[in-house]
């Protein structure tokens, strides 16, 4: 096949120039195809030597083409070429080898050509929707929205679309995106902001689509890891941990439930479980031992994860989507270590919340309560019984039974200093939080207090000087504590114990959490970055203060980690535009105004607000907090 049947003339010329610039050495190109699969644009990703080049496939989007040259002119793939092409080819991409003159080509993996869809048969008086749902109301706005999304997915584009209330957005975006995913064997993600919309999709809209499309597909709702029971944690609980008989009964009921549950999902429970108990038995990412766990084969979370990996359509909330995205940012967009399986098409419903969700996700947070709770998980000096005294006490008890007396002496010699240093570290940390809290003691009442921390205003105040002095002491205590912990862990690791129940594992993970907490503490208290706004809140009627560092702008993060990785994305909501323009949304999200693969649509509501709606504001209503408010309001509405 002629190279010009696969690569446009301008792209051929660009590659010739780049290979010449690289002195004829290997160059790794990102090939960007048009709708018909012709490479119309190339971008240099890496330059190498005569025989090799870095293959940075994580910098490419799905459905593109790896192109690299062989300076020798011998266009036979190496073992590395085949391996890398195989990995990228799994995502629908292609891989070509060219010579330095760019007039010859070898196809390792052909570019997968996508099947285009046509949704016309589903809408209209004789459409499939109407045939399945007799009372279906045909709305021009819904068809207009659905056709716009059809064009976007067919053309490998992003689309921003505001559709007013009453459009029927979920059906409008589900039909084209789901149909496209099914026809091309792709995975679709629907990300929402609210539980209500997730339940609507799961229990109403998607089952309805199954009837309309008459096509087989699997779908699932992804829940956070903390919703699942962890068998290892559950059966490591000692009933003597709990003084209250009612608490012991709850633990017993959890164990009975484990015997019959298929999912281990907390929502199955008919009994409300206090969080203080649930968190001792739920699944947590950093406390998971994975395949090493004795319960791995029957793990609820990994069973759910397998179900997710086999699904064609996945429903998530925005927070989980960005939690997954942060992992992809660390290890590469197409990775097996992510929370979600790899995906190809994304719909963000309630997209006006994305910026806030992303900003919240990238926010650092510390609190007095959180600090005390974390240290208590390691060592709780107020409790002497084994289970609730913290993971350190459990580790010491375990080591005392596993090691002979001479080996345990080394541990025992560090025990006192480790506990004393933990206590001192805790006391100084609480002292700092209390110093921050003290100026607002008189204001604490029924409402939350929120203030921005302006370093220039407070740095010369006596209160800030006290905090700075205490923080210097706190840092010194942390350094000494870290040294002692390292000595303690080195002794343990030298013995290579089995740790079947994960007692040492849990202790190490809580220490890791403490290290991360201290890093966040330093970042917030130092207040040095101009890219963040620093602020705090004081909880009403409680001696708890929370401190935050929130990024001013997340657009670059979103541009680099999301928008540059995928094209087929739908951003929709009833409120995205300001005065009929998407400028603010685009700027806050990191969109390029000149992006040729972006379309924008503004669809009005089918409701005639001017003639069908009135706004009434009662001037004599009672306090909304009154128990009589609803009854009084009913009377008011009846009068209307």
Sequence positions of predicted segments:
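Active-site-proximal loop/helix of nucleotide/amide-processing enzymes and allied scaffolds
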Residues: 1-6, 14, 32, 46-115
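Walker A/P-loop
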Residues: 155-176, 188
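Helicase-associated low-complexity/disordered flanking segments
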Residues: 94-95, 102-144, 150, 154
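A contiguous, basic/glycine-rich beta-loop/short-helix subdomain that forms a polymer-engagement track
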Residues: 279-314, 325-335, 474-477, 481-621, ...
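Conserved beta-strand -> loop -> alpha-helix junction used to position metal-binding or nucleic-acid-contacting
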Residues: 190-196, 214-231, 340-353, 366-377, ...
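Pre-Walker A (Motif I) flank of P-loop NTPase domains
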Residues: 154-159, 186, 312, 567-568
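A substrate-engagement module of RecA-like helicase motors
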Residues: 116-132, 137, 185-187, 191-314, ...
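Signature of the SF2 helicase/ATPase Hel1-core->accessory helical subdomain module
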Residues: 173, 179, 199, 204-207, ...
């Amino acid at each position: 096949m002629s190279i010009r049947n696969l690569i446009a003339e301008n792209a051929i010329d660009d590659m010739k120039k780049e290979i010449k610039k690289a002195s004829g050495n290997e160059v790794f190109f990102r090939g960007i195809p048009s709708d018909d699969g012709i490479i119309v644009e190339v971008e240099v990703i890496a330059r190498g030597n005569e025989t090799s080049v870095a293959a940075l496939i994580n910098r490419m989007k799905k459905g593109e083409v790896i192109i690299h040259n062989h300076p020798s002119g011998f266009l036979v793939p190496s073992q590395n070429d085949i391996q890398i092409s195989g990995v990228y080819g799994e995502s629908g991409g292609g891989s070509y080898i060219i010579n330095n003159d760019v007039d010859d080509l070898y196809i390792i993996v052909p570019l997968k050509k996508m099947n285009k869809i046509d949704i016309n048969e589903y809408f209209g008086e004789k459409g499939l929707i109407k045939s399945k749902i007799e009372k279906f109301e045909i709305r021009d706005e819904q068809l207009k929205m659905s056709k716009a999304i059809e064009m976007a997915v067919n053309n490998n584009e992003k689309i921003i679309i505001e559709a007013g209330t009453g459009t029927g957005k979920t059906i409008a975006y589900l039909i084209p995106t789901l149909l496209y995913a099914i026809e091309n064997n792709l995975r679709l993600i629907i990300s929402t902001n609210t539980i209500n919309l997730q339940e609507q999709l799961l229990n109403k809209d998607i089952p309805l689509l199954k009837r309309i499309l008459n096509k087989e597909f699997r779908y699932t709702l992804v829940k956070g890891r903390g919703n699942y029971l962890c068998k290892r944690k559950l059966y490591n609980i000692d009933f003597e941990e709990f003084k209250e008989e009612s608490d012991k009964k709850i633990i017993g009921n959890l164990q009975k439930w484990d015997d019959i549950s298929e999912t281990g999902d907390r929502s199955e429970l008919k009994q409300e479980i206090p969080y203080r108990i649930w968190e001792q038995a739920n699944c947590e990412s950093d406390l998971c031992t994975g395949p090493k766990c004795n319960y791995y084969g029957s793990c609820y979370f990994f069973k759910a994860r397998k179900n997710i990996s086999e699904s064609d359509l996945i429903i998530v909330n925005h927070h989980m989507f960005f939690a997954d995205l942060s992992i992809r940012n660390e290890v590469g967009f197409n990775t097996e270590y992510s929370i979600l399986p790899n995906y190809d098409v994304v719909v963000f419903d309630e997209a006006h919340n994305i910026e806030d969700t992303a900003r919240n996700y990238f926010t650092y947070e510390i609190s007095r309560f959180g600090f005390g709770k974390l240290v208590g998980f390691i060592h709780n000096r107020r409790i002497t019984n084994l289970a609730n005294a913290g993971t350190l006490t459990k580790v010491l008890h375990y080591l005392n039974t596993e090691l002979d007396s001479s080996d345990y002496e080394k541990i025992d010699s560090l025990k006192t200093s480790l506990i004393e240093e933990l206590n001192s570290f805790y006391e100084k940390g609480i002292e700092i939080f209390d110093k921050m809290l003290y100026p607002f003691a008189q204001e604490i009442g029924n409402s939350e207090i929120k203030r921005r921390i302006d370093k220039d205003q407070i740095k010369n105040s006596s209160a800030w000087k006290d905090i700075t002095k205490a923080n210097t002491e706190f840092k010194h205590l942390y350094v000494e504590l870290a040294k002692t912990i390292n000595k303690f862990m080195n002794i343990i690791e030298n013995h290579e114990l089995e740790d079947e129940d994960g007692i040492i594992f849990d202790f190490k993970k809580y220490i890791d959490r403490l290290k991360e907490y201290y890093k966040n503490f330093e970042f917030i208290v130092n207040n040095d970055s101009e890219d963040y706004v620093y602020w705090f809140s004081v909880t009403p009627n409680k001696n708890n203060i929370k401190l935050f560092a929130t990024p001013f702008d997340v657009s670059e993060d979103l541009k680099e980690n999301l928008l540059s990785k995928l094209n087929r994305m739908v951003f929709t909501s009833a409120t995205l535009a300001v005065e009929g323009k998407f400028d603010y949304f685009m700027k806050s999200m990191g969109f390029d105004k000149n992006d040729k693969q972006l379309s924008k649509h503004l669809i009005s509501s089918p409701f005639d607000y001017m003639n069908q709606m009135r706004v009434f504001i009662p001037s004599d209503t009672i306090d909304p907090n009154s128990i009589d408010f609803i009854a009084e309001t009913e009377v008011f509405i009846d009068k209307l």
